[in-house]
Amino acid sequence: MAKRHYIPITADVPGVNEGQRAFIRKVIRTALAAEGVDFPCEVDVLLTNDEAIHQINLDMREVDRATDVLSFPEFDLQPGELPGEEDADPGTGLVPLGDMVISMEHVAAQAKEYGHSNRRELAYLVVHSCLLYTSPSPRDTR
């Protein structure tokens, strides 16, 4: 079976266009390929604002502040482990890797702070989130 990832992107903030969605999908596919993910998988993305990510952070992690990106991996992996096709949802044939939530307000603020483009900052946050699905590390460090 050919590798085909499913990457739905929901935006509850204005100004997110199809070009940005395509860019995010490309970054995710590239990061997963670099990590050796060679099976069809699903990654769900929510693009939101500081207020919403603050509430999600509080509800899910009991951290009372906004942040740039949140990652919710589907699997609790050990170093060197990857989920595999045996973990696929029987209904879709896709391995659900997890969810990522990105504050577009933080993207803009951090891009300005670090002196680079919003696009570069968005790519950085997307890759950072993807690595938590494939390279286990402490999940509450960021």
Roles of regions detected by a PLM:
Residues 1-122, 135:
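An acidic/histidine-cluster motif and surrounding catalytic segment
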Residues 133-142:
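Single conserved hydrophobic/aromatic residue that forms the stacking wall/gate
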Residues 122, 126-131:
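Active-site His/Glu-centered metal-binding helix of metallohydrolases
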